[in-house]
UniProtKB/Swiss-Prot annotation:
Protein name in UniProt: Flap endonuclease 1
Major subcellular location class: nucleus
UniProt cross-references to PANTHER family, sorted A to Z: FLAP ENDONUCLEASE 1, FLAP ENDONUCLEASE FAMILY MEMBER
Origin species: Cryptosporidium muris (strain RN66)
Cofactor note: Binds 2 magnesium ions per subunit. They probably participate in the reaction catalyzed by the enzyme. May bind an additional third magnesium ion after substrate binding.
InterPro entries: 5-3_exonuclease, 5-3_exonuclease_C_sf, Flap_endonuc, HhH2, PIN-like_dom_sf, XPG-I_dom, XPG/Rad2, XPG_CS
Sequence positions that bind Mg(2+) 2: D181, D183, D243
GO CC list: mitochondrion; nucleolus; nucleoplasm
Gene: FEN1
The keyword DNA repair belongs to this UniProt entry's keyword annotation: yes
Binding residues for DNA: R47, R72, E160, G241, D243
Matching HAMAP family: Fen
Subunit description: Interacts with PCNA. Three molecules of FEN1 bind to one PCNA trimer with each molecule binding to one PCNA monomer. PCNA stimulates the nuclease activity without altering cleavage specificity.
Post-translational note: Phosphorylated. Phosphorylation upon DNA damage induces relocalization to the nuclear plasma.
Length: 472
């Protein structure tokens, strides 16, 4: 179920936290996937009669969950994504009441289904069929076995898969979590990815090409836009309604948000509430629910640091299992294997391709900016070349000390040392010339010999060259 009304609330009140992105944004990323969510989608395909709806093995058991999971997983690999599948463990005690309600709803749906079948009401049949879906242990085991044959890591959570995914993401073992349930945010997932199904909507890239669209939600932006702390956000989700407790009548997401902004926490809100207008449900142990969200039963991420490994797929074992035990056609399996082989190493290649080819769409404004940038670069290059030429000329003019461009630290130190000698000699030379000119001005032709300036310059240059050679 997730958090009631949270998705719509975020769209209206924290729109900056939700971004539409192309699947190319996940190239090379490790993504944790809530496996049960995907399995539910493919089992629902049976009821809706889609492309996986009528697939069974020789025993008459549905294989739509296998076919759907295999096909979508290969699509992930072809897109350069590295998936990690996380499966649910034992549900927390606080969820038992919700699970009992779900069981009752399935039983009621089964009764409605039988009635609709008798009446031939196809629309009601379709709706009630979907409501009777329940993932079995055998179906989960099938998918786990298939993923291991593909060489993809599989994690079995101690309790809620979404809590385990959040732990992996918070500790940096995965980039984001792919799920459709909003309570992944409540467990503290920094980045939630929705619609990673290659079918929901399209996204136009910089070149105008239509690509599969993802919805990415950043928790940090959610909190900053709403002006809430993480604990206040958890309280907001509890008040909205979740799988672990009942809801307060008359309080939806927006009302809960306004109350939290005013009173800061659930405790104060409950004390200030008009109990006649907003009676508390029988099961509303918000303290335990808050603890479950903030400190869930998970395997610590450090346990997986050396275990999240992608191995070479066992294509022979996969083919044999699909053909002999699941009644897949040989042609179909051969096609799967070919795609898996081609996807191998896709991550590195697609990363390079995207780095060199993904360029912003050129508009008239962008073109003008590019021209300005080009002009600035040309000016910088011209100045740089002038500086280099000046440096080379000044050095060569004073004894051809160095003609190559300074490239290393040693070259730079050598250049500075030589240049210092040159500057000192220039200064001394100027002082000598000034002194000689002063002598000539203050002396008569009879008592002062004429100084040969040309000879003096040659003498200074010779002395300078000798000093440089000595230093070398």
């Amino acid at each position: 179920m997730g958090i009631k009304g949270l998705a719509r609330f975020l769209v209206d009140n924290a729109p900056k936290s939700i971004q539409q992105q192309s699947i190319d944004s996940l190239i090379g990323r490790i993504i944790a996937i809530d496996a049960s969510m995907w399995m539910y989608q493919f089992l629902a395909a049976i009821r809706e009669g889609s492309q996986w709806g009528n697939l069974t093995n020789e025993a008459g058991e549905s294989t739509s969950h296998i076919s759907g999971m295999l096909s979508r997983t290969i699509r992930l690999l072809e897109a350069g994504i590295k998936p990690v599948f996380v499966f649910d463990g034992e549900p927390p005690e606080l969820k038992m009441e919700e699970l009992m309600k779900r069981k009752e709803r399935r039983e009621k749906a089964q009764q409605e289904l039988e009635k609709a079948q008798e009446e031939g009401d196809t629309e009601t049949i379709r709706k009630q069929l979907i409501r009777t879906i329940k993932i079995t242990k055998e179906q989960s085991d099938d998918v786990k076995y298939m993923l291991k044959l593909l060489g993809i890591p599989v994690i079995e959570a101690t309790s809620e898969a979404e809590a385990q995914c959040a732990e992996l993401c918070k500790e940096g073992l995965v980039y984001g979590v792919a799920t459709e349930d909003a309570d992944s945010l409540t467990f503290g997932t920094p980045l939630v990815i929705r619609h990673l199904n290659f079918s929901d909507g399209k996204f136009s890239d910089s070149k105008g090409n239509s690509k599969n669209s993802l919805q990415v939600i950043k928790l940090s932006t959610v909190l900053s836009d709403l002006g809430l702390s993480m604990q206040q956000f958890v309280d907001l989700c509890i008040l909205c309604g979740c799988d672990y407790c009942g809801t307060i009548r008359g309080i939806g997401a927006l009302t809960a948000y306004k109350l939290l902004k005013k009173h800061k926490d659930i405790e104060t809100i409950i004390n200030e509430l008009d109990k006649n207008k907003h009676p508390l449900p029988m099961s509303f142990d918000y303290i335990k629910v808050r603890e479950l969200f903030t400190n869930p039963n998970v395997i610590k991420a450090k346990e997986f640091r050396d275990k999240l490994k992608w191995t070479n797929p066992n294509l022979e074992g996969l083919s044999e299992w699909l053909i002999k035990q699941q009644n897949f056609s040989e042609v179909r399996v051969a096609n799967y294997c070919t795609r898996i082989k081609k996807s191998k190493g896709k991550t590195a290649q697609t990363s390079l391709d995207s780095f060199f080819t993904l360029t912003p769409k050129k508009t008239s404004e962008n073109k003008n900016k590019e021209k300005e940038i080009t002009k600035v670069q040309e000016v910088k290059e011209t100045i740089s070349n002038i500086n280099k030429d000046t440096r080379k000329d000044s050095v060569s003019e004073w004894g051809e000390i160095k003609t190559k461009i300074i490239e290393t630290k040693e070259d730079k130190l050598d250049f500075e040392r030589r240049n210092k000698i040159i500057q000192e000699d220039k200064l001394n030379s100027k002082k000598e010339f000034d002194y000689n000119e002063k002598l000539q001005c203050n002396s008569t032709a009879e008592n002062t010999p004429i100084i040969d300036n040309k000879a003096k310059v040659l003498s200074i240059k010779k002395r300078r060259i000798n000093r440089v050679n000595y230093d070398e």
